[in-house]
Amino acid sequence: MRKTAVFSAKKLSLIGLAAAATCILGPLSIPIPVSPVPITLTNLVILLNIYILGYHEALTCLFVYLALGIAGLPVFSGFSGGLGKLAGPTGGYLIGFIFLVLIAGFFIDRFPSSSLFAALGIILGMTATYGFGTLWLTAQMDLSLPEALSIGVLPYLAGDAMKILLATLTGPRLQKRLAQFQ
């Protein structure tokens, strides 16, 4: 009996390319003075990866990105890497991306023709990411919950709303365009 591969060569290539895109865009960040959490494009790239790959493969891609960062490659915000970055104040948001992929990916894959459900899934996934990251930030910096929310969530809401809009508008188009190559 012949076993089939978990991922086809094409899927592995797409996962590799998506991981590379995440590693290239992930370090680009804008520090803001009121917070240890910078503005990044990482969550947008992750959302587009869900559309392009589907959420199982996007989760694999995310784990590749996190593993490379933990191994010390400078793929996290500000061209940083290492286990210390994951264990630091912003590590909860990096780990929280797992929830983003699982929740948003479920909605995007389950309701492929509904941008409303996709947006709902992305909002729920971002909320879970914010929740985990904020609790982590609270513990790491010995902050109250309102303090952590004011530096770890509030400054990012408008930008993340734009990223959600951009992902829900461009994601399906990318998905359709790249489907012909899969």
Residues of each region from the PLM?
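Generic alpha-helical transmembrane segments of integral inner-membrane proteins
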Residues: 12, 16, 20, 24, ...
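Interfacial aromatic-anchored transmembrane helix boundaries in multi-pass membrane proteins
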Residues: 26-38, 66-100
